[in-house]
Every structure is written in C-alpha cells, then in structure tokens.
Amino acid sequence: MASAAEGDMEAELTRGLLWGFQDLSLNKLATSLGASEQALRLIISIFLGYPFALFYRRYLFYKDSYLIHLFHTFTGLSIAYYNFGTQLYHSLLCIVLQFLILRLMGRTITAVLTTFCVQMGYLLAGYYNTATGTYDIKWTMPHCVLTLKLIGLAMDYYDGGKDQKSLTSEQQIYAIWGVPSLLEISGFSYFYGAFLVGPQFSMNHYMKLVRGELTDVPGKIPNSTIPALRRLALGLVYLVGYTLLSPHITEDYLLSDDYENGSFWFRCMYMLIWGKFVLYKYVTCWLVTEGVCILTGLGFNGLDEYGTAKWDACANMKVWLFETTPRFTGTIASFNINTNAWVARYFFKRLKFLGNKVLSQGLSLLFLALWHGLHSGYLVCFQMEFLIVIVERQAASLIRDSPVLSRLASITVLQPLYYLAQQTIHWLFMGYSMTAFCLFTWDKWMKVYKSIYFLGHVFFLSLLFILPYVRKVMVPRKEKLKKME
C-alpha cells in the first residue's frame, strides 16, 4: 500500500513538474505577454548579444583574427538555428554563393550585377514562397539584412579594383583592396550584433573591429560599457512602453467595425496615435542591438573635436530627433539610419548617370519597397513617402522665399501653434503611410483608406498641383530671378 501511495505521489509530482515546465514554456510566456513565440525568440536573441559581446571583450579582443571570425560565425549560426531551425541553410547558401561569385568573377561589373540578381532574386523568391496575409517572423527577416550586406560587399570589392583617383572620397573609405576569405565573409555576415535586424555596416568597418582598431584607447579594450548601457536602458524603456500599450493600440482595430463606425475625426486621431506607436517595436530592437555593437567596439566612430569618443557608427536611431521633429524628412533622417545610408551609398548615388535626382530618388524608394517584400502595401507606403517628401520640400521652399509667409512663420508667439499643427499633420500622414506598410495586403489597407476617404492621397496630390500656383502669387519676381541665378 505504501509503495503504491509513493508511486501515486511520484506520478503526481512528475505531472506537476511537467505542468510547471510547460507553464514556463516560451509559448505560454509569449502568450502572457501578448506576443508570439517567434517575437519572444527574436527579443531573447537580440539580448543574447550582450553576453556574447562581454565574452568577446574578455577573451577575444586582440586575439587571432580567425578565432574572432569563428566566434562570430558560430554565435550567428546558433541564433539562426534558435529562431529558424534548419532554415538557416538559406543564409549559408547565399554566403557561399557570394564567396564563389567574388572569387570566380573577380572585381568586375559582371560580379556586381550577378550579385544583385542572385541575392535579390533569392530574397524575393523567399518572400513569394513564404507569403501569408499577416506579418510573420521567418527566415526572410534576417535574410533581407544579409542581402544588403552581400550586395554592398560586392560593390566595395569592385571599387577596390579601380584606380583610387577615380573613386569618390566615400568610396575610398569602403573599397576593399584585399580578397576576403570565406571565413571573413561568414564572420561579417553572422556577427551576432546585427544578424537579425541590422544595423548595416561595411566589411572594412568589420575588419577594423577584428584587428582591434575600433577602440578609444589604442592597445586596450574600448571604454564603451557605459555608452552601451545607455542605449540598452533607452531600448528597455521603449520595450516596456510597447509591451504595456500594444494590447490597446493594435492594427487589427483599424480593420474592425468599431473603427469604421467611429467618427471621421476619431478614425484620424487613432491612425495618428497608432502610426507613432507602431514604430516603437523597431526603435526597441535597433536601440538594443546598437548597444551590443557599442559594447564590442563596432559602434566606435572616432573622436570629436574635443577628443571625446563617438559611439554612433552603428546608430540606427536618433531618438531625440525622432521624437521631436515636425517634418517627414526629419523622421526619415532619424529612423533606420544605416539602411537609408546604405541605399544612398550603393543605389541612389550610383544612379547619377541618369542625370535626374528625382528619378534616382524614386527608383531608390522602389528598390526599398521590393526589398521589404512583394505585398502591394510596401509599394503604397514608399510611394506616399516619395510624394510627401516632394510636397514638403515645395512647401518649405515657398515659405522661405515668400516674404509674407516667412514673416508669418517667424512670429514667436505663434511658434507653439505652428509646431502643434505640423506635428499633427506629420504623424497623421505617417500613420496613413504606415497603414499600408503594416497591413500590406490590398484588401486590408484599401478598407482602411476608404474609411478615411483616401485623405493622404487627396491632401498631398492636391498640394502637389496647387503649390506651384501659390508660389507664383506669393514669391516676388526678383526672388525667383535671384534663385535662378
């Protein structure tokens, strides 16, 4: 009887322990936080960068380069496996293909074009084969980061074969003069501080890290702990805020009957608030990963004029500008900085032969839309960005050149009202653009746009055609002649 009772107790205890472990599973934890298991894995993986960075600082700084490349490759592959399982083969395959392209085709335009077609083609095929009606965290997420890295690598390698005098000062900084090995390309690609969500950085910058050059104290480990912790702390603030508010400010509500039946002004205000809030998940990830990059030294960006170390080489966010700017161009300049810099360096500036800056900008935004995915919402979002930036520049130029508008804009007592009006317009139409980006399928974003009567398109297309006529009336002829001269 006693043994039977003990057996029952053991069975009960085993069931209790199993239930406890199940209760502590990632899925249950994610559910309790209002997130998906994949999202929780992503956050855990990003934070894992800190112990990896500490290990690197303690044991590998100034060690043999092959050890550092192996460490970065192993940790990056581990993160890939933890998040995507055996689907990590996609990144491995593209890295090996890129190595072969560079070795077999050399420093040729053929290698650059082949790289662009192969890497972008693979990414777009991945988008096509994994597409669903909702946003999912899958292997294509880090792969889009990798795609830009490998295309940039091919272009820098190509520049390294040119006469140095024919390169711009920027191209000379990034040009690769040596021949990267497979291990070097792997370490560069899988670096744990940027593999999942960025930021973008060049092979040359990565190799400076490996050689121990990215430090404010030559010959010693960088004094980057405090700057890294500051970015981590700021990232945690955004993470807590997003976690607490995300159950109450959702994109699903935009599709609900409750939203559609609300007043027009309510629909606009909800879109404004949601448009600001939805970006915080990206801000969180980039601030946390920036802290990892700073901790390793990758974030070192030289010294300022006072001899103080700058740690913004991997900054993907200018938080103060992001939170305070009343302009769309200000948000663009403060958000996803390194990706925007990559597009400017490797795409926009390389289209100079077209002789048309607006066309180059439009093609760059089209590339960004395709890079994000094949859904129509991405195209609509970046089309709106293109339109808004053009109109904003027209409006700024009109106010600057018109004596009447310039005097009105300079009235101090009215500055708070101007700022409030600008911020309202700014974030309302940021939310309008982000609606297509986040809902991304035709039926979803079209439903929301119909509910607010395509306000963003009507407002900015109207201004695009009206502002030139307003300029003729408001800007004196002498100002126009002076500008032409």
UniProtKB/Swiss-Prot annotation:
The modification N-acetylalanine is found at residue 2. Pathway: Lipid metabolism; phospholipid metabolism. Keywords: Acetylation, Acyltransferase, Endoplasmic reticulum, Lipid biosynthesis, Lipid metabolism, Membrane, Phospholipid biosynthesis, Phospholipid metabolism, Transferase, Transmembrane, Transmembrane helix. It catalyses: a 1-acyl-sn-glycero-3-phosphocholine + an acyl-CoA = a 1,2-diacyl-sn-glycero-3-phosphocholine + CoA; a 1-acyl-sn-glycero-3-phosphoethanolamine + an acyl-CoA = a 1,2-diacyl-sn-glycero-3-phosphoethanolamine + CoA; a 1-acyl-sn-glycero-3-phospho-L-serine + an acyl-CoA = a 1,2-diacyl-sn-glycero-3-phospho-L-serine + CoA; (9Z,12Z)-octadecadienoyl-CoA + a 1-acyl-sn-glycero-3-phosphocholine = 1-acyl-2-(9Z,12Z)-octadecadienoyl-sn-glycero-3-phosphocholine + CoA. It is found in: Endoplasmic reticulum membrane. InterPro entries: LPLAT_7/PORCN-like, MBOAT_fam. GO terms for biological process: chylomicron assembly; endoplasmic reticulum membrane organization; intestinal stem cell homeostasis; lipid modification; negative regulation of inflammatory response; negative regulation of response to endoplasmic reticulum stress; phosphatidylcholine acyl-chain remodeling; phosphatidylcholine biosynthetic process. It holds the Pfam family MBOAT. The chain crosses the membrane at residues 35-55, 82-102, 108-128, 139-158, 176-196, 232-252, 283-303, 362-382, 420-440, 448-468. Disulfide bonds: none annotated. GO terms for molecular function: 1-acylglycerophosphocholine O-acyltransferase activity; 1-acylglycerophosphoethanolamine O-acyltransferase activity; 1-acylglycerophosphoserine O-acyltransferase activity; lysophospholipid acyltransferase activity. A motif (Di-lysine motif) lies at residues 482-485. GO terms for cellular component: endoplasmic reticulum membrane; membrane. It is a multi-pass membrane protein. It is an enzyme of class 2 (transferase). Coiled coil: none annotated. The active site is at residues 336, 372. Its EC number is 2.3.1.-, 2.3.1.23, 2.3.1.n7, 2.3.1.n6. The di-lysine motif confers endoplasmic reticulum localization. PANTHER family: LYSOPHOSPHOLIPID ACYLTRANSFERASE 5 (PTHR13906:SF14), PORCUPINE (PTHR13906). Belongs to the membrane-bound acyltransferase family. Lysophospholipid O-acyltransferase (LPLAT) that catalyzes the reacylation step of the phospholipid remodeling process also known as the Lands cycle. Catalyzes transfer of the fatty acyl chain from fatty acyl-CoA to 1-acyl lysophospholipid to form various classes of phospholipids. Converts 1-acyl lysophosphatidylcholine (LPC) into phosphatidylcholine (PC) (LPCAT activity), 1-acyl lysophosphatidylserine (LPS) into phosphatidylserine (PS) (LPSAT activity) and 1-acyl lysophosphatidylethanolamine (LPE) into phosphatidylethanolamine (PE) (LPEAT activity). This is Lysophospholipid acyltransferase 5. It comes from Bos taurus. The lineage of its organism: Eukaryota, Metazoa, Chordata, Craniata, Vertebrata.
